[in-house]
């Protein structure tokens, strides 16, 4: 949105709740982060959870963000895919179950985490602040098959290593293989050859899981990795030829259901 300040280091965000676990969606631009948030949010609403945008994330002068908070629920139900992804640059959503806060989910621009055109750029000040915040974090790294070219993928692996250095032992890490429907690994509705999918990620993003290898002399026998791996699909996207609009049709519930189960497991563990 045009209201975003030009200098990335002047961006201010405030996460006031330092107790509730924070889910971070991490990935390059256009990896489907925003639609992942929307798909999960839709699923949770249907399951009876309450979703609340946190208005204090951005300064009150950011009218675009306040509009976004006001229109959040209607945006969850719109079939127009582009509307959501164009509008959301920042979003902090609290997930509640019968009024009790379960977690908060942060969406921030992908290029602030990793810009393929400037892969070694320092993290913006506000992200360093989030990294340092004391609440438990669940780092959700988004990957996809055949993403850009080899050098971009290697740069992304390096970026994940840089982020991993910020991860506290109490935190949890999850790799989300998005757009799984565009791969050959789906064997049925919501059923995926997960081992083959994970190997494909290892082959195409060499060393991506290495920072998460469990080096503990005992527990590593039954848990070699300190990260989880899940396939994901937001849905299908079709262009209406009459108006050029991109429409979104939610995919199988199995994917957001599995993601939520994993997040709950992390939150409680």
Name each region found by the language model:
Residues 1-2:
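Charged, amphipathic alpha-helical linker segments immediately N-terminal to NTP-binding catalytic cores
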Residues 27-29, 97, 109-112, 233-236:
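Short, flexible loop/turn elements at secondary-structure junctions
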Residues 84-95, 99-136, 147-159:
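Switch II of P-loop NTPase G domains
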Residues 10-13, 78-83, 90-95, 127-129, ...:
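Catalytic micro-motifs at enzyme active sites that drive phosphoryl/nucleotidyl and oxygen chemistry
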Residues 5-83, 100:
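Conserved G1/Walker A P-loop phosphate-binding module
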Residues 125-269:
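Conserved GTP-binding G-domain of TRAFAC-class P-loop NTPases and closely related GTPase folds
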């Amino acid at each position: 949105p045009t209201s975003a300040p030009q200098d990335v280091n002047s961006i201010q965000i405030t996460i006031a709740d330092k107790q509730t676990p924070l889910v971070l969606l991490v990935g390059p631009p256009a990896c489907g982060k925003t639609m992942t948030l929307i798909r999960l949010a839709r699923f949770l609403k249907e399951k009876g959870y309450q979703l609340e945008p946190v208005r204090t994330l951005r300064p009150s002068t950011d009218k675009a963000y306040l509009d976004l908070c006001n229109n959040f629920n209607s945006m969850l139900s719109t079939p127009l895919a582009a509307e959501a992804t164009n509008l959301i640059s920042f979003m902090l959503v609290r997930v509640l179950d019968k009024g009790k806060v379960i977690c908060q989910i942060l969406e921030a621009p992908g290029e602030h985490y990793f810009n393929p055109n400037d892969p070694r750029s320092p993290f913006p000040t506000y992200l360093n602040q989030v990294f340092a915040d004391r609440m438990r974090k669940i780092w959700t790294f988004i990957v996809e098959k055949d993403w850009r070219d080899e050098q971009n993928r290697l740069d992304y692996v390096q970026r994940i290593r840089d982020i991993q250095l910020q991860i506290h032992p109490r935190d949890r890490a999850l790799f989300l293989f998005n757009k799984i429907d565009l791969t050959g690994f789906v064997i049925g509705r919501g059923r995926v050859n997960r081992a083959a999918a994970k190997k494909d990620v290892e082959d195409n993003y060499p060393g991506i899981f290495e920072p998460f290898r469990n080096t503990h002399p005992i527990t590593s026998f039954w848990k070699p990795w300190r990260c989880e791996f899940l396939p994901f699909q937001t849905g299908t996207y079709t262009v209406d030829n009459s108006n050029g609009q991109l429409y979104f049709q939610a995919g199988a519930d199995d994917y957001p259901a599995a993601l939520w189960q994993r997040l709950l497991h992390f939150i409680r563990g």
